[in-house]
Amino acid sequence: MPNLRPFRALRYDVAAADLSKLLAPPYDIISPAERRELLARDAHNIVRIELPADLGAAGAADYATAAATLDAWREAGVMVKDPEPTVTVHEMRWLDAEGSEQRATGLFCRLRLEEYGPGAGVRPHEQTHGGPKADRYALLQATQVNTSPVVFLAGSEPAATSAALLALVDRMPDAEVATTDGVRHRLWICAEAEAAPVLALLSAAPVTIADGHHRYETALRYRAHHAAERRGDADPAWDHLLALIYPLDQSPPALPTHRVIRGRPCGDELLERLAPYAAIERLADVKTLLARMAAPVHLTPGASGSGRIGVFTHGKAAVLSVDRVATGALLDAGLSEGSKGLDVNALEVIIRRAFGDDAATMAADGRLWYSKDAAAAATQVQDEEASAAFLLDAMPAAAISLVAAAGEVMPHKSTYFNPNAPTGLLLSPLEW
């Protein structure tokens, strides 16, 4: 089972600064232009630490500068360490596309690292690639601070866990801030004794990594690097990482990552190749397709996916209704029913059969890329930058946990959670 505990968080002194000017989005979505804007917003914006150069451009000197900057901020009192161990409840509120208010509530705490495997308290759900891990490792080595959390889905019973978590927010928040994406964030800092009931529930079942596989695996590498320093029963801080854990019924929505492809087949030829694996409903135009894919879909209880995939290729728009028998027969026989029911796994089969290569191979040589925006993916086809776009529906968070519980992982870039906790709400120094 996961080992969770309070810790002495490092926070901005909100009494002396405007928190809205100090936060940043997750590092991997910050463009060079946005990074410049964040730096101009406030000299102490967390992007100076989290992304010390444009994404992918940082070198050893940049990481060293980030570490020195953070040390200077601590010395000057810009960031202050909690005097006692605490946990922090984080709530997000936002309006969905229909204008209805949505809410997600999670808990910041410290989680003891452990390797993946049977019986482990931590489970991955997605395959990872190496590049981002090298960058995050260099930053961790230099700063010795977890600057952003790994996000987890709790495996414990949702109703009881949510009740214990929400019992901690029956008072005024300790901090409140709105970010530029329209999300309102509220924080409650809770003492160890106050947090004990919810920590006990969250620790009662394995947790699944929702976002941050690279950061988790980076922390494992960092721990292995320091293993020779371990002394007997010592409990070094580098044995832990910063976690943000959501009960299944309190998490942000798990949204789809669409596939965009360059190359043949395309148009009618592509749709003909898809026919053995799905019923094909042709639509009038891409506008109709985007409206259909934006419409909510109601899943049957326990279903992993809708079975609906949108396709736009050389002016041809269609909705596929996946034939689970046909696609399931081409997946590994040992896969769980939960994995076989995932739309993204059905799409892996469809791409492989239509194009003759798997998605990972096509991504590696530049023939396939990913988009979080369905309209942007379709526009790339309209502008002839790509030959086809495959659009997916969102999946339930419970399906992610189900696949992870079976010891399986989803394809790379299967999903993402949005909105996100901004970087800078709190940090976890690798110290006690």
Where are these predicted regions, by residue range?
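Surface-exposed, charge/polar-rich loops and edge strands
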Residues: 1-432
